Amino acid sequence: MATVASKQSQNSMLSNIWGWITTVDHKRIGILYGVTAFVMFLVAGIEAGIMRWQLSMPGLDVVSPDVYNQMFTMHGTTMVFFAIMPLNAAFFNYIIPLAIGARDVAFPRLNAFSYWTFLAAVLFMNFGFVVGAVPDGGWFAYAPLSEQPYSTNQGMEFWSIGLMLAAVSSAVAGLNFIVTIVNLRAPGMSLMRMPVFIWMSFVVQILLAFAIPVIAVGLIELTMDRLFGTVFFKPSAGGDPILWQHLFWIFGHPEVYILILPPMGIISDVLPAFSKKPLFGYPFIVFSGIAIGLMGWAVWSHHMFTVGLGPIAVSVFTITTMLIAVPTGVKIFNWIGTLWGGSIEYKTPMLFAVGFIAMFIIGGLSGVSHAVAPSDYQQQDTYYIIAHIHYVLFGGAILGIFSGIYFWFPKVTGKLLNEKLGKYHFWITFVGMNLTFFPMHYLGMNGMPRRIYTYATEYGWDNLNALSSFGYVILFIAMVIFIVNVITSLKSGEDAGHDPWNAPGLEWTIASPPPVYNFSDLPVVEGRDPYWIIKRRAIAEGKELPGPQALVDPSTVHLPDPSYWPAFTSLGLLIFATGFMIEIPVWFVKYPIAIVGGLLVFVGILAWSNEPITREKNH
């Protein structure tokens, strides 16, 4: 009997794993994105810890200069492309269909392909640690330092090809969500009735659609320089390294808004829920988000003031860098207006949202200072820049993401995160990040350059570096508290119910966690804050507050069937990418494994396109 039970348990586990591999359910894909991205967030944090350990005192030899360059490169790359972006994607996947009243995204299998290709990119780039070829050219990979002979191993191939895989994932996801938001909104949900999170997500998908091709061109050219001997960025052979900087930053500055706009949308949903009043200045927040998306294309060269662009170019980008602060300021004043006069409840999601506002103001002010070209010459490539980007991406994006995690965790799991541990997490994070990053402003103004692995006592940077490294320890403790909170809450947390925050969005009208079909009956939206409208009507009519939608038999709802072809196609892409790292000349073919991978991709696409979306039983 024990043997039979063991086999049944193994079969059940294998069936469950296969279910996750073949899933096309946006909610499961959102969870996959979130878990993978959080693991990579921790990996990036460990890489940062190694750097802070090395810099905690003058003259330390914790790691070699080569390893320090690898940690520096992988920390930035991982945090930007494999942590913050996919954490945002986790919210896109899970929340967008729920918040617009849809049963899934427009292209469920393409959604699955996006995740598996993202995972392929993560595995491919980090495989460099296994084979001793870790990228070491900086997360921005400035050519020609990222070219041969300055970076001699295969690390930068892992970097450039890995990011091309990530670019494929982001591009198809962006197009998928554009179609989803345009076509699958519930009846009555006009554009100006959409939640701000949906608006900011929509702007981000459009930014991705235009920004990804730019960096893809640069990555292809860099890879061709390294693998096939082209000279796009080699000045000794007529190439232009400044071309790489333009390509990278034309993508890179919209990328900043790709990272920060979703958390802005998150807190625009959190603040009204915990202020018990509608969002102040909804149209201004929406149009300021659109303005940020448009103006983000006009500021890239403030990263390049020391390149020698000339006074006219510097003057133009100085002006645009100042102007982009205006729509951001509009958002901040509207968020403050939402708080003003509200019945504020300082639950953990609200604390992280308010913390986001405070920290993003500091990051924004240090960013606007880059518009002063003469002082930017002094700030360029110093720790002042490190401080600025971390106040924007940690104080902004990460705090906003944690606000969203605490806000929607009950919807995803049906359990509330522990409020006491959550507040400990917030306050320790808040103190830790300021101890870590605020001293970097002074280090930069005192002349400490980025990317150095050690320094002499005579420079006077030791005390501030020690304080910054101590702040990292505080942040580490905060992350441990968060992980403990998640694990214990999943095991024995308080049941959340369907609407624990008395929130206004459509996602709170259904059970927690949501059924596989989301909505048994598609909702009809009568205005902004649709669930508040329903609840107020019930109160006015003397009725009980409405509960969640009634559950129905999933077999009666039209849903797409699982498919393994998206994962198969992504595996083909991974083999295709790996093939360029292994040179095995066969006849006239230099990279036969890449050809095998390409054939697998072709087979996957062909089979995918001929697979019916649903079987007859689900019609």
Name each model feature, range by range.
Residues 2-619:
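Membrane-embedded and interfacial regions of multi-pass energy-transducing membrane proteins
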